[in-house]
C-alpha cells in the first residue's frame, strides 16, 4: 500500500508533464498513461499555481498547445466504452477543477462549465450506473467510490445550474433514482441532498410521489429513522421529511397518505421531537454541568420539528386533512406548546421559526372565513383606447387591447413570490442552495422555444417615427448656452393648489393633501421593531377569543358606495389640523385623495379594524400591497389594532422589523415617522370561495390572503393621521418639487423640462435634460446617462431616490456634482407611470398591466409611458449615435435589505446563444460589473454587493433592464433596487430607512458614475 509520501512524490513530477499526460489520456493516445496511473495525482497537495494551470487546461476553453484540452474534451471523454477507473478519474478531475474555483476570474470559468452542460453528461452516466447497480446481485462487485464521486459531483454542480431539475427529468434520471431509493437501504452520502434538490421542482416532485411504491417505502424509512435518537439518524430523518414535503403536493399522493393516517403519525412525531428540542432550562443546565447535553442533537430535533410543521401546514390547506387535524386536537396541542415556551429563549434562530410555524399552523386549522369582496366588482374603471397597429419593421401583429395586455402581464418580478410559504421552511441558514441559486430552480411549463433559445418578438420605431423625438435633443444642434428661465418662472408662479388641480385622476378625490406632508424632512433614525413572539402573542389571543362570526362585523368605510358621495365641488378643500372628536362614532377612515388606497374597513372588535385594499384600476392580475389612508376620530392612549387583510405575498419585511409610516396633522412638524407595535405578517383565515371553486375546475393554485397586523396608540384625541406602506410621494409633489428645484438650481446648471408624451389619463410624462451650459461641439463630446423611476406606483422609495438625484444635480455645490454636469448629459424620466401613482395603484398603469413587462413591444395607444421612454433611448442609440454611458431604472424591493443592482451578464442568460453573440472579448471586459463595483467603492456601508444579480431569464426579456441591453446593446443597463425596510450592514445596520437615507442613495448613484469613468 503506498504511503502518503509516495502520493506526494507522484504529484511532484514536473507539473507540465502531468498536464500533457492527462491530455494524452483524453485523446486516447496509444502511449498514454492509464486512468489508474493518473488517479493518485488527484490526492496530492497542490500549489495555487498548479491549480490555476489545471483549471486553464481542463476547466475552460481549448488550449492550442495541448492535443486535447478544455472542459468539452473532458466531457467528450465520458462518452463511449469507458472502464470504471476511467470514469472515476474523469469525475475526480472535474470535481477537482470545480472545487478549486475561488477568485472572480474562476467564477467565470465555473459558469462556463455549467454552460457546457456537465449536468446532462453526468445524468446520462449516473442513469447507466444506477441501472447496472440494480441489476448486479453481488454487492462486492460494485465500486462504491465511483458512486460517491458521481453524486458529489452532481450535487456540487447541480447547485450552480439553474436548470438542473429540468435536465434531470429530460435525461430520464428520476425513475432510476426512485427505484434505487426503494431497493437500497444504504445510499451514497449526497444522494438524498441531490434528490431533495430536484424534487423542489413541482413537476419532478409529483413524478416522484406518483412512482409506484415510492411513498410507501419513504414512510417505512421515516418510521425506522424516527425510532432512533442518534444525531446522525435524526438528521437523516430531517432529509426524509423534506423529501416527503416536496413529493406530496399532488392530490393522489395526499389521498394515499391520508388513508395511512399521516396526520396522526406526524402529530406524534411533532410532540416527540418538540420535547427533545425544547428541554427546560433547569434540565439543560444540569445536563451541561454533567456533560450530557448534546447541542447538535437538540439542533437536529429542532430541524425535524420545523419540517414536520411545514408538512402539517401543507396538509391543512386541504379540507379533509384540516378536518382530521382539528379532530386530533391540533389547536390544543399548538396552544399548549406555545404557552410553555420560555419567552427569552425563542427570539432568534431556528427555534424562533418553530414559534412562528406553530402559530401559522394554528391559523390554518381555524375555520376559514368567506372573503367579503369575492362577489363584488370594483366600481371604478377606465375605458381603454383601441391598440395602435404594430410598429413598422417589428414582428408583432395587431390585436385588441385586452389580448395584448393579457399576453404580457404574465411574468413575476424579482419582488414577487417564487416559492410557497411552507417551502421556505426548508431553505436553511447553512443551505448552499438558498445562497447560490441565482435563478429559478425549475423550468417547468417552459415551451420548446425557450429551451431552444428563441427570443421574444420585439418592435422598434422607424426613422419617420423617431423624427418626432428630435425636439427633445435640441442641445445637439443648439448647445445649452441658452437660458431656460422664462419657462421656469412661469411654472413657479403656480400654487400647490393649482398643481394638485391639474393632476388628472380616475379614482375619486375628496380632498387635497398638504404640501408639508412631503417637504418636511424625516431625519429621525428609527431602529427596526422587535418581532420576537409577536405571532405567538397574536395567536394565543385569537385562540382565547370566541369563534368569529362574519355577521357580527360592522362596515365602517366602503369606497364602493362612498366613492362619489359627498365630494366637494368644484373646489376641493385641503385637510385641516383636526382636534375634534365625535363621541358617537368610532374611528373614521378615508382614502379619497391622491395616491390613497383603501377600499373597505370592517370593525371586528371595539378597537380592532380589518382593512381591505383597492385593486389597481383595470388590473388583469391581482396586486395588493400599497396602502395609504386617513384615520380620524381617535382617542388618546387607546391601543388600536389595524389589520390589512388582503395582501398576496407569502413573505414580507413586516415580519422582520419593518413598520408602516404615519403622519399626524397635529404633529406635522415631525413629518412622517415609523409606527406600530406587535407588527406581524401571516396568512389569515379569508378564502375566496369563487377562486377555490374555479381552481377545482381549472387545476390552478388557490388564492390565499395575508395580513399585516399592527397596533397604534395615538398621542392626540381627535387627531387626523395618515398611515402608509412607505413614505408617500405623489405626482403632484413631483411637479411642485421640479418647479422649486429649478428655481433653486445653481446658475451654472442647464435644466430643460420636456413633455415626451401623455399618460392614458392625460398626465404629462416629463423628462429633464441636465448638464452645464456648453456649445454644440462641447455637447457632442459628452456622454449621456439615462435614469428613470417609478414604473411601479407602490415603490415610492424609488421617487425619493430620484428626489436625491435631482436635488444634488440641480442644487448642490460640490466638485463632484460640477464634474458630473461637465462630463455628462442626464436624461431623466422621474416618474414613468403617473396614472398608477395618482390613483393609488401598487403595480399597474391604467392599462391594468405591469409597464415593466412592456418594453419589448410597447403599444403607443395603450402604453404611451414606456413607448415614449423607450423611444428616447432608441433615438440616442440610432439617431444621435450616443449609446448611453449607463441606463438605470430605479425600483423598490419589499423582501430584501439595503440597496443593490440587477444587471445583465450574457454568460448567465437563459439563452445559450447569448454567450456566442457577445463574443469573448466583451465578456472579458465585464462591463456588467461596472456600476456595482463603483457603488461598492463609493458607498460600501449602504450598498450590498452580495444581493446583486446578473442573470437574464426569459420572463425578464420584456423588462427595461434586459430590453435596453438586448435591443440597443447597452451593457451598463441596470435595475437599482432599494429596501422598504432598512439596513443590514455598516453604521446603519439595525435601523429602518427614511427619506434622507433614500436621497443619499441617489447621491451615491451619482458619485458612482464618476467612479465608473476611472476604469
Swiss-Prot record:
CC per GO annotation: cilium; cytoplasm; dendrite; microtubule cytoskeleton; perikaryon
Cofactor note: Binds 1 zinc ion per subunit.
Keyword Nucleus applies: no
Principal location: other
Start-end of Acidic residues biased regions: 416-451
Positions of the catalytic residues: 977
Recorded GO MF terms: metallocarboxypeptidase activity; tubulin binding; zinc ion binding
Family matches, as SMART domains: Zn_pept (SM00631)
Tissue expression pattern: In hermaphrodites and males, expressed in amphid and IL2 ciliated sensory neurons. In males, expressed in CEM head neurons, RnB and HOB tail neurons, and in gubernacular erector and retractor muscles.
SUPFAM superfamilies in alphabetical order: ARM repeat, Zn-dependent exopeptidases
Binding site for Zn(2+): 792, 795, 891
Names of required cofactors: Zn(2+)
Cellular localization per UniProt: Perikaryon; Cell projection, Cilium; Cell projection, Dendrite
Domain of life: Eukaryota
Region listing for Disordered, in residue ranges: 384-462
EC numbers: 3.4.17.-
Domain Peptidase M14 residue range list: 727-1013
Disruption phenotype: RNAi-mediated knockdown at the L1 or L4 larval stages causes a defect in egg-laying without affecting uterine and vulva muscle function.
One matching Pfam family: Pepdidase_M14_N
PROSITE patterns: PEPTIDASE_M14
Keywords: Carboxypeptidase, Cell projection, Hydrolase, Metal-binding, Metalloprotease, Protease, Zinc
Gene Ontology terms: biological process: egg-laying behavior; proteolysis
Function: Catalyzes the deglutamylation of polyglutamate side chains generated by post-translational polyglutamylation of proteins such as tubulins. Via the deglutamylation of tubulin, regulates the localization and velocity of kinesin motors and the structural integrity of microtubules in sensory cilia. In male CEM sensory neurons, regulates the cilia release of bioactive extracellular vesicles. Also regulates microtubule dynamics in uterine muscle cells.
Protein name in UniProt: Cytosolic carboxypeptidase 1
Organism: Caenorhabditis elegans
